[in-house]
Amino acid sequence: PLLIAIDCPAVEAHATANAAVAATARAFRWPHGPLEIVAQPAPLGLVGNVFFCGAAAETYGAVVLLEDDLLVSARFHAYARQALTAYGDDPRLAGISLNSPWFNGLTHQPFVPLPDDGDVYYLQLSTPHGQVYTAAQWAAFRAWLAAAGPQTGAVAVHDLLLALPADDWLGTKARYLADTDRYYVYPRESLTTATGEPGTHFARVTSFFQVPLQERRRDFRCLPFDEAVAVYDGFYELQPERLDRLTDHLRGRDYAVDLYASKPARRLTAEYVLTTRPCRAAEATFGRALWPLEANVIAGVPGRGIHLA
């Protein structure tokens, strides 16, 4: 079934636009199965309405969650079905992303996951640009949300995410992922793109979030979590254990990865840190000739742009 959830306007000034949205929904024809339109009787806000839709996974077994400013590929359903088959029973995963962002959301630098033998990578952050959940994945999040305090998991999350306003749920999801050590699986080629229309978070249109859509692929290589090299933490940094699979330059050391130089001191608790920050006494150094940055460590590029200290 297709479920369209329309929030109740919180102020009278939005009532006319809200009525137009409801009329558009009622006029929509869905030939693929049942269509249900839910007009919320009281304002839930963006977060409440999104979580209402996510909870549909517990009713139907799984849900594809799309906000209204997304354009989807014709292949999104094939990817969602294949990803659910591959990952639906893995308790280490909190959800499946339909979107593949082009940038690091904390530093706004380009983000390029290292290639491996799969069409996916893993990241300890969520996305607002299209997700898929199983009933078990949403139930786990719901149970955590009911028990968690406002600071649960916060020590392991970037300050930018902790400072997000109440009408943004990415910070809450980041705390959940950090606290429970769960990940989202992401496609390397995006099945959604954000049109960047004005709304709750943007006063005018933006193309910043747009990415190319994969419109042709029919079969996706859903590499299991344990076999993947491209596994990233909540700071877009490659997990040390995965980096050690690609090079022996750091193997045997207890180190944190901070190549984007965005981790606060509270996250740098390992014996060593691999970083692009200036260091006075580095045990090893690497250049910065290659992209992504970890490629310099893998190739042993000489230089002093990256430090193990």
What are these regions (language model features)?
Residues 1-66, 70-309:
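Peripheral/terminal regions associated with large enzymatic or DNA-binding modules
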